[in-house]
Amino acid sequence: MIYNSFLKRHFRKNIVYIFFIVLTPKCLIAQTDPAFKPISADIIKLSSKVLDEDRKIYIYIPPVDTLLPDKRYPVLYVLDGDNHFSLIAEYCRYLSRKDVNVMPEIIIVGIPNKNRTRDLTPTNSIIDYDGKPDTSSNSRFKSSGGGNNFLQFIGAELIPYVDAHYKTQPFKIFAGHSFGGITTINCLLTQPDMFSAYIAISPSFWWDKEYLLSLADEKLKNDRDINKMIFYSDADEGMSESTFHTNLLKFDSIVIQRKIVGLDHKYAYYPEDTHMTEPVKAYYDALRFIFRQWDLPLTDLKSLNATVVKQHYQQLSQRYGYSVTPPEVNVHNIAMYLIAQYGALDNAISLLEMNTQNYPASATAFSQLGDAYLKKGDRSKAVICYKKALALKPGLQNVKAKLAGASENQ
C-alpha cells in the first residue's frame, strides 16, 4: 500500500515520525477500523431456457457510494459458487477498502452447482483421472459434456441479467477451480471476448485424454491478438509428477512459446498446498495479479500533483476499459502528506481541486480545499469553497466558523 511505503521509506527519524502522526489523518498511517458487517448477497432464481431449468445465483454488491450514486462496478463470475463465493467476496471487500486500495470495488456473481460434471466439462467422456473408462452403471461421468451449453447460458442469459439489474462496468472476470478451471480455459479458447480476465485454479486438463491441451495448441497461435489476462495455478496433487502439474506446465509452455500479443499471463505453483486448500491462496494471488497496477506507484513524492494522479488513473481506465475515478479519501490523504512533509501546498491544492471536480456533491471536498486556500492566504477562494460546502450540507457548524473567520477583513 502506498501510504505504508511512504512511512517505511521517508520516516527514518522518530521525531519526524511523531510529528507526522500528529498532523496526518489516521487512515494514512494505519488501517481503519470499520464496523464489522458480514457478507450479504442477493439470492436470485434465474429461469434458463438454454439449460431448461431454474438456476440459483448469488450476487454481492458493494455498499452504495453516496457521493457517486450512479457508480458502476466490474464483475467477477465465480464457478462452484456454493464453495468459493464467500471467500472471494471477502477478499474483494478487503482489498478494495479505501485504506488498502489495491483493487476496485467489484460485484461478485456466484454460480452454485446443479449438475457439476455436466456443466463444467467441455466434452462427453467416461475416462477417469487415471485414464481408465468408468463403465459402471452409476458412473458420475455419464452426464458430462455440457460445458459449451453452460457457457451459452452464462453468455446469453446470466450476464445480460446481471447487466440489466445491476450497475456494471464492461470489465468482467471468470474464475473457476478444477472442473471450473477447465471451464474458464475453454471459454478463453472458444469465446475469449465473453470475459476480460480469466482465473483457472488447478484446471483438470486430464479430462478426456487432455482434450483442452490439444485445443489450446490449436487455438493459441502466435498470429492472434488476445487482449486478455489469465492467471493459472496448481498445487501438490500427487507430488511434482502429478497429472495436474505436468499438464499445467504443458499449457504454460504453449502460452510462453507462442508469445501471443496482448495475452497477459501468470502461472503460480503451490507445492505446500493441496487441491482443496490451494484456492485460498490462489484466488488472492489472482486478484493481485489482475489489479497489480491499481494503486499509485511509488514515485518522487515531491512531484505528486493532480497531473500525476490523473495520468495514473487514465492508464487504469485504458487498461480496464472504463473510467476509473481516484478515491476522494486517498487523494485528500496524499495532499495532507505533501503539506506536512514537504510544504508542497500548490501540489496539494491541485489534488484537492481535482477532488471537488470528481466529487461535486461532497461538502467535505470543498471544505478541505477551502482549508488549503486559507493556509495559502487566499481568503476569497477559501470563502467560495466554504460557501459551496455549506450549500451542499448546511448543518456543518465547523465550516460556518471557518467561513466567518475567512470572511473577516476581506
For the regions a protein language model found, what residue spans apply to each?
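C-terminal catalytic histidine-bearing segment of alpha/beta-hydrolase fold enzymes
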Residues: 245, 249-252, 258-324
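Helix-start (N-cap) detector for alpha-helical repeat units in TPR-like alpha-solenoids
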Residues: 324, 328, 345, 363-364, ...
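A domain-start/cap signature at the N-terminus of enzymes
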Residues: 30-74
